[in-house]
Amino acid sequence: SKLFNDFWMEDQGFIERESFGDLRDLVGRPHGEQATITVGPTDVLTTAHNRLRNAGFSQLPVMDGGRLVGIVTEDAIIQFVYGHPELMAAPVEDAMESVFIKLDKTASVNSLVAMLRVQPYAAVLDGEDFVGLITRSDVLNYLRRQV
C-alpha cells in the first residue's frame, strides 16, 4: 500500500528525508539504506525483467560483491534477446551495460542534468561506493520538492 511506502510518502512531500547538500539528495532509493533493487551478474535475464516489471523501473544496478559492475536496462534486454527468446535464460552480465555515466556525489546538479540528456540515468558514487541511481524522474521529484 502506498500509505505505508516511505518512498512514495517522500515523493509526495509527506515525510522529509535527510538532506546532504549533494547528489545524494536526488537518489530515489539509496543503496546504503538497502532500498535499491538490484540484480547480480549471474542472475538470469528473466530475474532482471521480473524485478524491472515489478518495481516499474527501466534500469537496475548490477552488483557483484557490493560493487557496482553494470546496469541492465529494458532496452539492453530487448536488444539482446530480440529474435532469440531463449536468451532470457542468459546471465545478466551478457546483456548489461558496463559503460555508463558515473558521477561523484559532490558533482553539481548542472553536471547531472547535462549527463541525463545523453543517458536516462546516472550512477552516483561516494568514492568507489555505490550510492544509487538518479533518473530523470528523480530530478523532477527533487525539483518539485524545492517549491
Features from the language model and the residues they span:
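Tandem CBS (Cystathionine beta-synthase) repeat/Bateman regulatory domains
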Residues: 1-147
